[in-house]
């Protein structure tokens, strides 16, 4: 048992509660939290980007979605941790409730849970007479020194809108304000980025906007935020319950007013023409970086996953990337069955017949994240590799070319239905088909998935998103093919022009329509 488990259980006893929810996120509710700031990682040893843990005096449950089923099993100590593998459509709150006794008390950190999640916990667990208690402290957290941010302003020719124009679109009335705590929204509104961060370029802070003024709290001034928000005299402060923490919402008290549709979310996800043009240039550079890496795999022997990752990121810099938009995935053979594998080991040597899955992206001068996935083969593939690759390619082509959709879940259904019917034995598609892209590599809306609120948002022109079907089988391999796309005149267009691997395509499995669709993409 590690020291953090002991700390969690000591907290249960001291506070006289039965359960503690330990989060993967931080005070800004980010998706990709640094491991050094990730309490759930300290508690469980699991390094995935999402997934929370439930602690009781006798058990610890780790809840993970399909991307992390295999990885969680590999990383946790099963003597201490029980991995709960969520399936598509499972609701994590329902799974939490199943593992809690009636008439018990759950403690959560108010600074690491949104108001929306807090209220849903109260509602769901209330059905079992479970009380949810808020705490301002996280007993697992390891405090890290704060580094002053070095901020870069993105020029108008790359954003298409000034900060003032974006704030005016908030349409606030006299003595009204809006609180923005989502880092991507903050970066978008201010046209600022912090390129010194690893795998992200969002600025860190919180801001309040009024009709004619804005108040930004960051670095040293962030400590003044609680006092400001508690004592502000605005009649109304609008908040997005999905992104405001329960702590900040409580501080606002009666001044807080939930908005049904966040105006920043709406304007951020519909890209300007300048942003689209920047994206086209950024993806052309990303394509080149990945294509040269594929050539490196083909032309060199006795290279490792680590060597390929080094070459990949060198190529990104060569073509103008300021940094990576997430931790690059370079996964050979059975490692590619882990959707978010990120070890890139020096010990994993590429051999004849090896598959290499690369999922990567970068940031360029415009501060928008690129994202692409391709699979390469060293030498000649076997029949199963070709069959799985071609099946995934067919799913991509069908989803990319569909015109029968209103929202993201409609496109997801096209690929999912096909893969459910045609996947080779044991191979599964266990994640959403795609996600929005923008300041962050994962932006919402849109989302191409099933049943989430953002997958039901109508798709509009200039929305940008990925299409990334995949098939995975533990101890065998995984195939994922990902293009980042945008909507134009209600048709899906691809930013990505990176070729597909001809050696891995079984053309006998393609019908004439699929061959015609494929002809619009480079195959070599």
Feature names for model-found ranges:
Residues 1-524:
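Active-site neighborhoods and metal-handling regions in enzymes and metal-associated proteins
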């Amino acid at each position: 048992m590690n020291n953090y488990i002991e700390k969690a259980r000591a907290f249960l006893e001291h506070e006289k509660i039965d359960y503690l929810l330990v989060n993967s996120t931080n005070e800004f509710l980010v998706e990709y939290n640094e491991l050094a700031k990730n309490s759930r990682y300290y508690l469980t040893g699991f390094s995935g980007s999402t997934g929370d843990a439930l602690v009781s005096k006798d058990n610890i449950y780790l809840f993970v979605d399909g991307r992390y089923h295999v990885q969680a099993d590999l990383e946790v100590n099963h003597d201490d941790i029980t991995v709960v593998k969520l399936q598509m459509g499972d609701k994590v709150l329902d799974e939490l409730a199943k593992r809690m006794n009636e008439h018990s008390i759950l403690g959560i950190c108010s600074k690491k849970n949104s108001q929306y999640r807090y209220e849903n916990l109260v509602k769901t667990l209330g059905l079992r007479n479970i009380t949810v208690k808020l705490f301002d402290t996280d007993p697992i957290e390891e405090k890290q020194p704060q580094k002053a941010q070095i901020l870069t302003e993105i020029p108008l020719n790359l954003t298409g809108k000034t900060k003032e124009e974006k704030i005016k679109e908030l349409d606030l009335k006299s003595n009204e304000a809006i609180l923005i705590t989502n880092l991507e929204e903050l970066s978008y509104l201010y046209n600022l980025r912090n390129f010194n961060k690893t795998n992200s370029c969002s600025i860190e802070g919180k801001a309040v906007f009024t009709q004619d003024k804005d108040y930004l709290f960051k670095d040293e001034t962030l400590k003044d935020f609680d006092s400001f928000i508690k004592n502000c005299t605005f009649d109304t402060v609008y908040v997005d319950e999905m992104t405001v923490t329960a702590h900040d919402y409580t501080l606002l008290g009666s001044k807080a007013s939930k908005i049904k549709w966040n105006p920043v979310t709406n304007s951020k996800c519909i890209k300007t023409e300048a942003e689209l043009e920047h994206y086209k240039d950024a993806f052309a550079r990303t394509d080149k970086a990945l294509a040269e890496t594929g050539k490196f795999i083909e032309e060199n022997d006795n290279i490792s996953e680590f060597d390929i990752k080094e070459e990949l990121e060198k190529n990104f810099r060569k073509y103008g990337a300021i940094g990576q938009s997430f931790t690059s995935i370079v996964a050979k053979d059975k490692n590619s069955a882990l959707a978010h594998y990120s070890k890139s080991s020096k010990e994993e040597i590429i051999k004849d017949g090896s598959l290499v899955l690369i999922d990567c992206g970068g940031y360029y001068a415009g501060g928008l994240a690129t994202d692409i996935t391709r699979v390469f083969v060293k030498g000649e593939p076997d029949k199963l590799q070709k069959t799985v690759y071609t099946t995934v390619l067919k799913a991509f082509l069908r989803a990319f070319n569909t015109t029968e959709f209103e929202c993201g879940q409609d496109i997801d259904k096209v690929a999912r239905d096909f893969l459910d019917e045609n996947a080779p034995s044991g191979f599964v598609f266990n994640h959403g088909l795609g996600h929005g892209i923008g300041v962050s590599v994962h932006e919402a809306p849109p989302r191409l998935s099933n049943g989430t609120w953002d997958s039901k948002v109508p798709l509009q022109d200039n929305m940008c998103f990925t299409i990334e079907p995949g098939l995975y089988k533990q101890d065998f391999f995984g195939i994922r093919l990902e293009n980042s796309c945008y909507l134009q005149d209600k048709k899906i267009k691809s930013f990505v022009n990176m070729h597909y691997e001809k050696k891995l395509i079984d053309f006998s499995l393609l019908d004439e329509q699929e061959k015609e669709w494929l002809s619009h993409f480079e195959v070599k």
